[in-house]
Structures are given as C-alpha cells and as structure tokens.
C-alpha cells in the first residue's frame, strides 16, 4: 500500500511512502502508520492534510490536527508520471500533491521543506483526463 499524494523529498530526489506486506492489516492501522511516519517531518497536531492511499483502489482520508477520517472519493487519479529514487542520504522535506477540493495546512518540523504541487487530473466516465 502506498501514498500517492505525499512523498519525501531528499538530497537525491523524490521517495515514495510505501508499506509492504499489508494483506493482513486493516486500513485504519495502515493510515495510522503513514501518519506516524509523517510525524517525523511535520507537526501532525497543528496540520491539516489529505492522504490518498492506493492498494487496488484509491481511498481518501483527511488528517485534521491528528484526527483521521475517511472522505468521499474525489475521482482524482494521481497518475502523473513522477520520477522516484531509492538511494538517498538526507531527507530535506515533504511534498504534497493537492487538488482544488483538498487544501492543506502543514507545519514542518526541524527545518524540513514543505512542497505543494497542484493537480486537477480526474477520472471521467471511464477516461482519465
């Protein structure tokens, strides 16, 4: 299972948030684990953001100052071709892909950068536009 709208920025490039071997783990535990991982880089209790999780389907969650809730699917596909790296030395920040209906307010920790990129790529009637 992976986050498709939040990535780590490093000295070498962008890195995915992925949790492997998730067959026997419930979705709420995985979301809590993603938020726990993010808490190393941002103040969760002061931030508001969305997590878009992809397994076989895409699921949307909102984290509002640490309170997590599932939200309706917005039909954004998050399928732009992005480049990722596997080897890096230092994490420099966190990148959030946001949409017009998924605003965010992020308070970083320890001088980490917060990068935001906007997308409006939606799924319409069987087409990804």
Swiss-Prot record:
Pfam family, one: Chordopox_E11
Principal place of residence: virion
Superkingdom of the source species: Viruses
GO CC annotations, alphabetized: virion component
Factors inducing expression: Expressed in the intermediate phase of the viral replicative cycle.
This protein's record includes keyword Cell cycle: no
Keyword Methyltransferase tagged: no
Localization per Swiss-Prot or TrEMBL: Virion
Signal sequence, start to end: none
Keywords in alphabetical order: Late protein, Virion
Family to which the UniProt record says this protein belongs: Belongs to the orthopoxvirus OPG073 family.
Protein name: Core protein OPG073
Name of the encoding gene: OPG073
């Amino acid at each position: 299972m992976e986050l498709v709208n939040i990535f780590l920025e490093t000295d070498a490039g962008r890195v995915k948030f992925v949790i492997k071997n998730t067959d026997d783990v419930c979705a709420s535990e995985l979301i809590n684990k993603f938020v726990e991982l993010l808490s190393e880089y941002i103040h969760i209790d002061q931030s508001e953001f969305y997590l878009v999780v992809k397994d076989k389907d895409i699921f949307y969650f909102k984290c509002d100052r640490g309170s997590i809730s599932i939200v309706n699917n917005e039909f954004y596909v998050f399928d732009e071709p992005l480049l990722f790296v596997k080897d890096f030395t230092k994490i420099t920040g966190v990148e959030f892909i946001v949409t017009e209906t998924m605003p965010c307010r992020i308070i970083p920790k320890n001088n980490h950068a917060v990068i935001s990129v906007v997308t409006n790529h939606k799924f319409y009637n069987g087409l990804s536009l």
